[in-house]
């Protein structure tokens, strides 16, 4: 019997789910992906891949600024910036990634339909569902499905009094159409997206002002990490309005005017709105299958991505779980394995590593320090500045640190934070420790290359060790050694 699967949305959740179905059950599944924005979704075409490509280009200026300290006297101002070339590279790479994913899906026998999908069941509670796909030219097709995965993603949140025009008032998806650098960029919002673009544009020499709703940037990230980033921003001349919310953003003759709720104003040439996202859950016909949207119009799912409607799953940013491509992809895979009757392990959010791609990068995994400080989790903590690391000194790295958290009684690693130029890579050993419940002693006994930035992770683990950890490890080692010794039991005559 063939299981017919229709996936609404071709982003990480959608295409990963399609690949799972097509590769694990190729003889018994018929997979269709309906997508109106392009395979890869916003993560590949508009958000994650483009922004990180843009950041990679601007990062070259970071190295140039460090060059004089390393004996290379390069005139920083001679590094001419071709913004059209940078943007062309961003768009080319995103399109190529989308094409690669599309080709992979097609090679696996997945049907890809360009259009918008909508559930058209005649009544709630049906075991099989009907979906209508509407193409850009208005033509339609209908499809039956035993399993439906809603993976429609999210879009930039729009402030009614700050309508983006694609010229001066922008969302992060419109930046790559600019022909020239802003004379003065105002970034409204200081979360992950806002912080990343503040960092990138200051590296390009653009004066930047930030309107932050909290008393520091990155309000939902590690407080010490946010402080390091604020210091880095201050060194580059970033002007920061704290505890400020934008009431409106309007066009002026020369640019834009941002008016805050407390009456303060700031003028600039361009405004970038980074005030969060809203789920793409309207117009999908969800009410026809008995699904009611939850808070913020997100789809409510359980830990294996099921909705309350039979045979209908949801994954990715439309569920509001965590706005990360890695989480969306994992949700999609879990949903499809479960739908096909495979055993699955529910997603564990405490094992998800995330990175803010600023300079320095900020990466974290597991239990945050704020939870520990609040007394909710009994833990030991360590914070080791990166400036003590020999490799960091060699490269003139002045900002950053490594944090590790472990359970007070057992020494099991439960979380950590890395602030460093390549924190997105360095967080992996801590994430592995959290995932596999490794102790700080086991992490400390791992031999790190010298000199290396990863050496700070093992050094932090050593400093976090307690005498009880050593006693437990000694007993464990003795038991393991004993197990290796042949035991010749006496035999009776």
Swiss-Prot record:
Highest taxon listed in the record's lineage: Bacteria
One biological process term in Gene Ontology: cellular detoxification
Binding sites annotated in the UniProt record for FAD: 12-13, 35-37, 42-43, 52, 117, 317, 324-325, 450
Reaction equations catalysed: a quinone + NADH + H(+) = a quinol + NAD(+); a quinone + NADPH + H(+) = a quinol + NADP(+)
Listed Gene3D superfamilies: 3.30.390.30, FAD/NAD(P)-binding domain
Cofactor: FAD
Cofactor note: Binds 1 FAD per subunit.
InterPro entries in the cross-refs: FAD/NAD-bd_sf (IPR036188), FAD/NAD-binding_dom (IPR023753), FAD/NAD-linked_Rdtase_dimer_sf (IPR016156), Pyr_nuc-diS_OxRdtase (IPR001100), Pyr_nucl-diS_OxRdtase_dimer (IPR004099)
Pfam families hit by this protein: Pyr_redox_2 (PF07992), Pyr_redox_dim (PF02852)
Molecular functions (GO terms): flavin adenine dinucleotide binding; NAD(P)H dehydrogenase (quinone) activity; NADH:ubiquinone reductase (non-electrogenic) activity; NADP+ binding; NADPH dehydrogenase (quinone) activity; oxidoreductase activity, acting on NAD(P)H, quinone or similar compound as acceptor
Enzyme Commission (EC) number: 1.6.5.2
Coiled coil: none
UniProt keyword terms in alphabetical order: FAD, Flavoprotein, NAD, Oxidoreductase
Family to which this protein belongs: Belongs to the class-I pyridine nucleotide-disulfide oxidoreductase family.
Additional comment: Catalysis proceeds by a classical ping-pong bi-bi reaction mechanism. Was identified as a high-confidence drug target.
Role played: May contribute to virulence by increasing resistance to reactive oxygen intermediates. It can reduce 2,6-dimethyl-1,4-benzoquinone (DMBQ), 5-hydroxy-1,4-naphthaquinone (5-HNQ) and menadione. NADPH is the physiological reductant rather than NADH.
Quaternary state and interactors: Homotetramer.
Protein name: NAD(P)H dehydrogenase (quinone)
Biological source species: Mycobacterium tuberculosis (strain ATCC 25618 / H37Rv)
């Amino acid at each position: 019997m063939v299981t017919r699967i229709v996936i609404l949305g071709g982003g990480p959740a959608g295409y990963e789910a399609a690949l799972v179905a097509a590769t694990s059950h190729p003889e018994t599944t018929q997979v269709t992906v309906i997508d109106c924005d392009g395979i890869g979704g916003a993560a590949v075409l508009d958000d994650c891949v483009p922004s990180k490509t843009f950041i990679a280009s601007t990062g070259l200026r970071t190295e140039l600024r460090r060059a004089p300290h390393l004996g290379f006297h390069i005139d920083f101002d001679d590094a001419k910036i071709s913004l059209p070339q940078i943007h062309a590279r961003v768009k080319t790479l995103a399109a190529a990634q989308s094409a690669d994913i599309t080709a992979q899906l097609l090679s696996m026998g997945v049907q890809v339909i360009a259009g918008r999908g909508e559930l058209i069941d005649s009544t709630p509670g049906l075991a099989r569902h009907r979906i209508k796909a509407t193409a850009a030219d208005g033509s339609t097709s209908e499809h039956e499905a035993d399993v439906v995965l809603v993976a429609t993603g999210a879009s930039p949140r729009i402030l009614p009094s700050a309508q983006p025009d694609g010229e001066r008032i922008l969302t992060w998806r419109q930046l790559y159409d600019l022909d020239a650098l802003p004379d003065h960029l105002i970034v409204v919002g200081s979360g992950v997206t806002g912080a990343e673009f503040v960092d990138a544009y200051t590296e390009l020499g653009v004066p930047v002002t930030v309107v932050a709703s909290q008393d520091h940037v990155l309000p939902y990230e590690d407080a010490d990490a946010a402080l390091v980033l604020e210091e880095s921003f201050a060194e580059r001349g970033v002007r920061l309005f704290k505890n400020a919310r934008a009431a409106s953003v309007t066009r002026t003759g020369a640019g834009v005017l941002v008016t805050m709720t407390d009456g303060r104003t700031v003028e600039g040439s361009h405004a970038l709105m980074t005030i969060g996202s809203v789920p793409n859950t309207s117009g999908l016909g969800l009410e026809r299958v008995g699904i009611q949207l939850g808070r913020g119009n997100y789809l409510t799912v359980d830990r294996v991505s099921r909705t309350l409607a039979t045979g209908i799953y949801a994954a990715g940013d439309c569920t509001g779980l965590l706005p990360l491509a890695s989480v969306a992809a994992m949700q999609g895979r879990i949903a499809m394995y479960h739908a096909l009757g495979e055993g699955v392990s529910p997603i564990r959010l405490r094992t998800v590593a995330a990175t803010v791609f600023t300079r320095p990068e900020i990466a974290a995994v597991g239990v945050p320090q704020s939870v520990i400080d609040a007394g909710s989790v009994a833990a030991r903590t360590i914070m080791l500045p990166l400036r003590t690391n020999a490799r960091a000194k060699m490269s003139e790295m002045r900002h950053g640190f490594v944090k590790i958290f472990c359970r007070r009684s057992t020494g099991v690693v439960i979380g950590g934070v890395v602030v460093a130029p390549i924190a997105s890579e360095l967080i992996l050993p801590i994430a592995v420790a959290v995932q596999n419940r490794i102790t700080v002693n086991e992490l400390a006994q791992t031999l790190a290359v010298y000199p290396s930035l990863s050496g700070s992770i093992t050094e932090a683990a050593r400093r976090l060790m307690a005498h009880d950890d050593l006693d437990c490890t000694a007993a464990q080692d003795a038991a393991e050694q004993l197990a290796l010794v042949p035991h010749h039991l006496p035999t009776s005559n």
